[in-house]
């Protein structure tokens, strides 16, 4: 069993929804021994036929930030997701409070990724943070975060109870840290702007030394060199 949970905050009272998420997490742990892989915290936002002023339960930014902090404290092992529904300012604040997964360069309309520019009249919701992926990656690194494109656990079948055991023992760091740096390296080599690549190379050189397991660290350094030479798809 491997699940993600979440609600759209603002449809009903946020206290009910917040407690509901935590009770759901508690039930999953008790019944299955496996909590949520991720918790998503979107909030009601403008769209073609939606005005947030019509929703009396819409959540102000300061309350939204408290919701993120409470969930992070209560479920320290889960990945917490925020989308481009939220503004750059809000996303920056909640990254400091517990968000670990964000989107960048998102399109919410049908077929939105097929053309560089297209009519967004079919968009599911309005995007508040309209920066490109490169701009988001650059921004994250300037704040000291490691942008990771890793999907190694899913690809290796490291989900459910296998994933939880790594998380709760803290050993996941010996997978996540090098995988994050290697996938960032791939992005820098293949897609990044010159400025983003320069910042990223400096970040990788600093962070690779922090991988706790010596054998993993040495192998990751070797893989990073091979990525520079054009090889791809290394993972722990």
Residue ranges and their predicted role:
Residues 1-50, 60-89, 96, 101, ...:
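Conserved C-terminal portion of the radical SAM core fold
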Residues 51-60, 120-126:
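Glycine-rich tight-turn/loop motif centered on a GG-T
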Residues 92, 97-100, 106-236:
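Radical SAM enzyme core and accessory elements
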């Amino acid at each position: 069993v491997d699940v993600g949970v979440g609600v759209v905050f603002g449809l009903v009272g946020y206290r009910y929804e917040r407690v509901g998420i935590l009770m759901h997490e508690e039930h999953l742990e008790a019944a299955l021994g496996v909590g949520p892989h991720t918790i998503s915290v979107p909030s009601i936002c403008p769209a073609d036929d939606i005005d947030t002023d019509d929703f009396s339960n819409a959540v102000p930014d300061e309350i939204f930030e408290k919701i993120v902090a409470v969930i992070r404290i209560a479920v320290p092992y889960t990945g917490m997701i925020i989308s481009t529904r939220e503004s750059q300012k809000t996303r920056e604040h909640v990254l400091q409070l517990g968000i670990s997964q964000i989107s960048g360069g998102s399109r919410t309309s049908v077929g939105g990724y097929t053309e560089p520019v297209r009519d967004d009249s079919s968009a599911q919701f309005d995007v508040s943070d309209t920066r490109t992926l490169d701009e988001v990656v650059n921004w994250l690194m300037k704040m000291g975060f490691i942008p990771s494109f890793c999907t190694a656990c899913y690809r290796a079948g490291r989900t459910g109870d296998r994933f939880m055991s790594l998380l709760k023992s803290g050993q996941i760091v010996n997978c996540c840290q090098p995988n994050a740096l290697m996938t960032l390296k791939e992005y820098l080599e293949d897609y990044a702007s010159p400025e983003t690549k320069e910042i990223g190379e400096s970040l990788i050189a600093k962070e690779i030394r922090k991988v706790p397991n010596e054998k993993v660290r040495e192998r990751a350094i070797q893989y990073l060199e091979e990525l520079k030479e054009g090889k791809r798809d290394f993972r722990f």
